[in-house]
Every structure is written in C-alpha cells, then in structure tokens.
Amino acid sequence: MLLIEVASCDDRADFALIARAYHFAKKYHEGQTRKSGHPFLHHCVEVARLLAQLRMDHTTVAAGLLHDVIEDTPATYGDVAAAFGDKIADLIDGVTKIDQLPYESREARQAETYRKMLLSMVKDIRVMLIKLVDRLHNMRTLEHMRAESRARTAHETLEVYAPLAHRFGLARIRWELEDSSLKFLEPEIYDELRNKVAMKRRERETYIEEFKAPIEEKLHENGIEAEFTGRAKNFYSIYNKMKARNKPFEEVYDLLAVRIITGSVRECYHILGLVHGIYAPIPERIKDYISTPKSNMYQSLHTSVIGPTGQYVEVQIRTAEMHRLAQFGYVAEMAAFFGLPIRERCEVVACPEDAALEEAAPLRMGPPQLQPAVPERERELGKCWE
C-alpha cells in the first residue's frame, strides 16, 4: 500500500529504492515491538506514509522507512551509507538521538540532540520534516507509554515540535500535535472540549449554512466562483482562548472559522468587501496576509465579523494555491526540489509573492487523493517487494 500511495503522488519515484529500504528496515527491526505491541516496522511504514502524503521525494520516503535503524538497531551509519548512499545516511543521522555519549542529565543530552538536529536541518530541511512526522506518529501511540513519559513527551511536543510545524507552515501537523499534547497534559479539559464541540456539531453546521447563504448570493450576483468550508477551531486554540479571557467554553464566542477559497487574488479582496457589506466587521481583527505574508510565507485575508445572532465568526479568504500551501507547508513544497540545499530553497521562498508561487507551480501537491492502481501498475509495484 505504501508504494501505491507513493505512486499516487509521484509516478516517477524510485520504487525499487523504497522497497530496498523497506526490506533493510524489516531485517534490522526483526523481532522488535513497540510499547503498543505492534511490530516496530509498523511505525517506520507509517512515518514513510506520512512523508508520502506531504508529497516528499522518494529519497525522503526511503529515509522515513530507515529513520530508526541507526538509533535502535545494530546498523551503523556506514551500513546505511553502503546500502543507500551518503545522502540517505545523513538524513537518518540527522534525526538520530544522541544516547551513546555520557551526559550529566537527560536535559543536557536532549539539548545536544536538538543542537544536532538543527545543524543537520541547515544542510537539509528534510531532516526536520522526518522528525516532525516521526513525532506525529509517536503522539498517536503515546497512550501506551508510562505516565511520566507521556507528560514529558507531550510538553516537549508543545514547546518544540508544534511551534516548528507552525513556523514552517504545516498547519495540519501543528493542530494535531497541539491537540494530542493537550489530551495527555490536561485530559479532563481535553475530554470536556471534545464532548462540547461534538455536541454542538449539528448546531454549528446549521449556523454556518445560515451564515454563508447571503454571501453565496452576493458571489453569484458578481459572477465569482468560490468554495466554502467551515470548522470549529482546534481544541488547543479553544483552550488558550478560555485561559486568556478567563471564560468558560460557553462564553467564548469566536470558535467558528469559515474559509472561502477562490480563483485569484483580486477575487479575494472583492469577497472581503462583500462579506463586510453583509456582516459588521471587527476592525482590529482584519489582517491582510496576502500583501504582507507571515514569516512562514502563509498568505490569506483574515477578518472576524458579527454573524447572525451576534456570534463572532472568523473568515479566511484565499486562493486555491494559497490554501494548498497553508495546509501542507512551504517547506514541504520547497523540499520537493530533489537535493536542493536549504539556502537555495530559502532564496526561492524569499522571492516576491508572485515569483514564489510561479517557482512552486510545477510542484502542485494538493491533498492526497489515493486512487486504486490499475492492475498493470499494481503488478509492477508488487514486483518491488519480491
């Protein structure tokens, strides 16, 4: 299934390389199990699958399969380099924790591990991406760890990995890391928020339909095509609002976010004017991240308006290209340039907005759409595992 998923993202990928990495990992992780009781290899495959969903190149997917062999098996850097070359060996070494050398404390060892990871990241940004998805899958299985380990890992995730994901524009990864950290650090609050958000789901969907109806009418009158999505904000975001305002869940009103995706920058501004003509805006909440992108190159128009019944609603307006990059990250986009050093990638990102999008255009990587492979393709991919 991993090869079929990679094929759905890049049919030019080196499937033989990925298959060799799979068999190498299988050999060295033989007999190892995780705290969950699952074979260790399952974690390696999941990390590789997540990297494939980020549209990463076959070298990175292979490194995802191998990311723990130096740290957790007898395999050495030399073994990996001999089998797969220095580039993959360097990626794996970059995400390998420093456990072999003596340190006065766990904190000192962890600090040195961070330092090593950051230095490796300067050479190749894919080190950070592998580490992020490794942490993401570890958080999905964290309940099998001891209570002390759960708390320590959740704190580290919230303080280090979620901000990294945010910094590099990986919104989906950031939200899941934040919410899963809250789940283990404040389980009662997490369960309460999850239950209350779930209870209000039908009410929320009805409200969003009522909210967007007059906007859709205006868009139709002006000949603008757009797609609407609506969601509640993630649990950690809601939790922070409750803390900052010292209010219970029921008194935090701006929990709804509506996203409008359209075809051009010009239409984004046109839609903003139409929305403000229908609903009263809150002036201090209007943000133009299109003309002035965030430091991670995120682009969108943000506004908060007073919707029906007086409830605050956040509205985000962006183009389809901006939305794709907001969801999957500019770093994932740039890292898709096979072997391109981080400094060169940063030069691409630092171009003026239009030029940056033109540079990224050939690497279109929308949300994963895993399609059944045709029989011939399945047979071809299947041979790689033999």
PLM-predicted stretches and their roles:
Residues M1-V313, R318-C384:
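Active-site helical microenvironments for divalent-metal-assisted chemistry
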